Amino acid sequence: MGVGEMNKEVIDKVIKFLMMVILMGTIVIWIMMPTSTYKEIWLTSMRAKLGKSIYYGRPGVNLLVYMFPMILLAFLGCIYLHLKKSTTVNQFNSGVEKKRAKFGALRRPMLVNGPLGIVTVTEVMFLTMFMALLLWSLANYMYRTFVNVTSESAATDGNNLWQARLDLIAVRIGIVGNICLAFLFYPVARGSSLLAAVGLTSESSIKYHIWLGHLVMIIFTSHGLCYFIYWISKNQLVSKMLEWDRTAVSNLAGEIALVAGLMMWVTTYPKIRRRLFEVFFYSHYLYIVFMLFFVFHVGISHALIPLPGFYIFLVDRFLRFLQSRNNVKLVSARVLPCDTVELNFSKNPMLMYSPTSTMFVNIPSISKLQWHPFTIISSSKLEPETLSVMIKSQGKWSTKLYDMLSSSSSDQINRLAVSVEGPYGPSSTDFLRHESLVMVSGGSGITPFISIVRDLFYMSSTHKCKIPKMTLICAFKNSSDLSMLDLILPTSGLTTDMASFVDIQIKAFVTREEKTSVKESTHNRNIIKTRHFKPNVSDQPISPILGPNSWLCLAAILSSSFMIFIVIIAIITRYHIHPIDQNSEKYTWAYKSLIYLVSISITVVTTSTAAMLWNKKKYYAKNDQYVDNLSPVIIESSPQQLISQSTDIHYGERPNLNKLLVGLKGSSVGILVCGPKKMRQKVAKICSFGSAENLHFESISFSW
């Protein structure tokens, strides 16, 4: 190990230590927040020292205690991921082996058939701890409510005892809801360093957003109902509902936020989400209304508690917006006989992504507003100039695309305008640690495994490392779906040498058809039309929005935007808010909240735009020209012959997963599954058996 690598390892350990300290400190704050010790001692002391500042006033306490640590944590996460990105394959896998040996059991499925879906031991542990935090907070608040509120104290406010307690219970429930809201946006920040630093992807984290979303709406709805009952008992329902206090909680703003939240919540019902995806998709833009009026409701001082996650989400969302403004070069499309198309885009060689990554695609000629996620089937290492996605016709949007490209008039289409966001995926993968890799798919669930196979083909010849034996178990409804197997290898980039290092076996099952003749099956698979396009000069190769050092650039955006934000707030507070307010909370809450939100928006927009333009000027003009001049490498026959010779097709039956998976030999067998819910549950159940200690389960799901 060289001096540079040793220094990098030391820096890596220091960053991990700092991140752990910040995380533990934040957890302690959340645990102590509902206690009297926090309110009467800690908070009082902090407000005495910071709350009277002429530069920040009362919001300065929450700005320092809640917002600053999370922005710093995200910043350190970016630095950690940048260092990790340059780790060699052998270094990475040696480290992974040690970690997996210790914590492999925590990744095993624990809950399989339940409302939460497939949940691992680790997820159950963290879910239990989070629910314990909510119950701890609620219990502390309720105890203080029932102890401190007496008949005498209630009478001074003109309330009965039950009314006074109901009033405080409603407040406490709302405060507990803020805990859930504080974590709500982290899982949907697709390019977040916080997700990548702990090995999570945006797709795998969606379920956490769903869980938190349900909790947020259950708690906030209960909060609102308690107040409605209280106001009705006081004969003040209408007047209180329309009340917008200048220097206190705004009831009307809270109701608007709640209605926006309820509209989003209703559309998440599975039948509505699947059958009326457009309704679900468009209604979720109400998150802007929800968060805006939530801040107006509670005031900026209290809103800073759950705001860090939203801040990180805003940075990510605006970067995605900048990327989506460009049309990308769609080079060609392959139309398969199974109502499936493969779109091939030109890619900047500096854009690197891991297998199983996803990309969001927008085609304005089909829908100007709809964005749909698709798994990337190409390998950024094997195909440095091309990025490919496979799209199965399963909804209105994808059906329109297939009809457009498969119709007889498709020859008249010279260009298709496409915009993309992404790719998004794991910061690294650890498939090489396994002795063998078993991939189980159903239908279009084969797509993430195509990218894995291609990546391992490349690594087998270039890194000269041992590649796990691969077994692909794929189930299809019809024989025409077998044409998806022809996409396992790309049309260019492979050489004969690569095939000699790979051991792969494919077991394909056609469930709805009996055995057909070899001639008919081959005929169905060979009907693949290729459509070439002529992109405009303005169309660009898909490129990383923040350049080759994207994590460093994101760290710069997070740090600079936050520093500029606190400087702007300090100036405005010192020369505008403080002369009026004098730390007496007399300044209108809505105006102060608006100042903070506008300042955040301005800093995020300016720093993100500046970073994007700087990277575009420095890297892309030169590399775009390079991409256009690259000549394709035609695939040799041996790799394709290997796939054909390794494929075993079974007609009229489903894969017997118990027979195929139970008793697999080897100290480490990776089991990956992507397909229908029942298939994923079946595989998870097999891997959860006590006798399956050598099976390491991972589920890849398209369904939210």
Curated annotation (Swiss-Prot):
One of its GO terms (molecular function) is metal ion binding. Its cofactor is FAD. Its main location: membrane. It catalyses: 2 a Fe(II)-siderophore + NAD(+) + H(+) = 2 a Fe(III)-siderophore + NADH. Residues 1-16, 82-115, 232-282, 351-550, 615-704 are cytoplasmic. PROSITE patterns: FAD_FR (PS51384). It is a multi-pass membrane protein. GO terms for cellular component: membrane. Residues 37-62, 140-207, 308-329, 574-592 are lumenal. Residues 174-294 form the Ferric oxidoreductase domain. The keyword Ion transport applies. The chain crosses the membrane at residues 17-36, 63-81, 116-139, 208-231, 283-307, 330-350, 551-573, 593-614. GO terms for biological process: monoatomic ion transport. Heme binds at H209, H223, H284, H297. Residues 323-430 form the FAD-binding FR-type domain. It is found in: Membrane. InterPro entries: FAD-bd_8, FAD-bd_FR_type, Fe3_Rdtase_TM_dom, Fe_red_NAD-bd_6, FNR_nucleotide-bd, RBOH/FRE, Riboflavin_synthase-like_b-brl. Its EC number is 1.16.1.7. FAD binds at H372, P373, F374, T375. The keyword Membrane applies. NAD(+) binds at G422, P423, Y424, G425. It is an enzyme of class 1 (oxidoreductase). Expressed in siliques. Detected in roots. Ferric chelate reductase involved in iron reduction in roots. May participate in the transport of electrons to a Fe(3+) ion via FAD and heme intermediates. Belongs to the ferric reductase (FRE) family. This is Probable ferric reduction oxidase 1. The lineage of its organism: Eukaryota, Viridiplantae, Streptophyta, Embryophyta, Tracheophyta.
